[in-house]
């Protein structure tokens, strides 16, 4: 008697993995194919807590979404994050946990300087999107929030909780807008509507960045996504994922395995048939 096989999940392109491949093909391989573990940064944990708290906030009736309620959701949000990754309970010291939660509350307080969540209801929060493009490229990702106006216009919203240093701010904004256009293309092909507005909410800086794409721009960007996926597939067939040294290497946790730093990557496991979002 043969044991049942797990259902095959098609490899797909996500905003983060597309960014990895553009930054460094070898980094893409380490993250998407080798699945090498990476310790979560405090910034990532803080961001996860804030996102979870906002998701819980918008699940409440609009009249209940006051600042005091948002702040009270920080601890339950931390519990939700730890429930997904139980090892964090042991890895994060109590003092660090308290610091993270304090910073998360400060970010949520800042959110109310940008929007009033009691005045509207989003269509969805943390919405999973998946769509196949005309050439077979599969896009997959999660959108922080989708708002729909009474007249039908879409607004795509993403919360940014980090604060990039001045020398990296331009790159951070470029990556953020790449992500938003990715979601805009996915929603265009899913719903047949060009999002009227892409909104980035920088909670640490109390800044809002709005952008209105047009159809021609998204069609060009769609071709860019197709080209990235074709390049990934080509590298996947041969295992030729080369490092691309840059200033960003300073933040990479895989330098000991990188040829650019005298390391040797693990044997290439081959292009996976059933791994998650690439």
Where are these regions (language model features)?
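Anion-coordinating catalytic cores for phosphoryl-, nucleotidyl-, and glycosidic chemistry
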Residues: 1-7, 13-26, 129, 143, ...
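Short amphipathic alpha-helical segments and their helix-coil junctions
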Residues: 8-10, 25-38, 85-87, 162-166, ...
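Metal-dependent nuclease catalytic regions and adjoining charged, substrate-binding loops involved
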Residues: 12, 68, 151, 184-278
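Nuclease catalytic cores
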Residues: 18-19, 23-62, 101, 105-109, ...
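Short, compositionally biased low-complexity segments
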Residues: 20-28, 48-49, 66-87, 193-203
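Short acidic (Asp/Glu) and glycine-rich catalytic loops that position anionic groups and cofactors
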Residues: 26-34, 51-54, 83-84, 158-163, ...
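A non-catalytic, helix-rich entry segment at domain boundaries
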Residues: 53-125, 132
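Mg2+/Mn2+-dependent nuclease catalytic core
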Residues: 127-225
């Amino acid at each position: 008697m043969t044991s049942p096989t797990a259902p095959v999940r098609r490899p797909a392109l996500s905003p983060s993995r597309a960014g990895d491949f553009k930054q460094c093909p070898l980094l893409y391989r380490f993250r998407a194919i080798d699945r090498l573990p990476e310790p979560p940064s405090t910034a990532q944990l803080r961001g996860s807590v804030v996102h979870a708290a906002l998701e819980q906030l918008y699940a409440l009736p609009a009249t209940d979404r006051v600042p005091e309620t948002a702040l009270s959701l920080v601890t339950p949000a931390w519990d939700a994050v730890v429930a997904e990754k139980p090892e964090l309970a042991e890895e994060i010291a109590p003092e660090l946990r308290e610091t993270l939660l304090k910073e998360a509350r400060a970010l949520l307080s800042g959110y109310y300087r940008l929007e009033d969540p009691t005045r509207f209801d989003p269509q969805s929060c943390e919405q999973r999107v998946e769509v196949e493009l005309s050439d077979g490229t599969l896009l997959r990702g999660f959108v922080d929030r989708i708002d729909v106006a009474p007249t039908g216009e879409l607004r795509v919203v993403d919360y940014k909780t980090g604060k990039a240093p001045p020398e990296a701010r331009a790159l951070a904004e470029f990556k953020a807008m790449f992500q938003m256009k990715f979601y805009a293309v996915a929603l265009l092909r899913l719903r047949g509507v060009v999002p009227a507005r892409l909104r980035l909410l920088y909670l640490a800086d109390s800044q809002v960045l709005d952008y209105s794409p047009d159809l021609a721009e998204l069609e060009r960007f769609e071709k860019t996504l197709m080209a990235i996926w074709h390049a990934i597939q080509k590298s996947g067939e041969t295992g030729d994922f080369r490092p691309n040294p840059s200033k960003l290497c300073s933040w990479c946790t895989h330098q000991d395995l990188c040829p650019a730093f005298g390391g040797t990557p693990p044997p290439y496991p081959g292009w996976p048939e059933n791994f998650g979002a690439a």
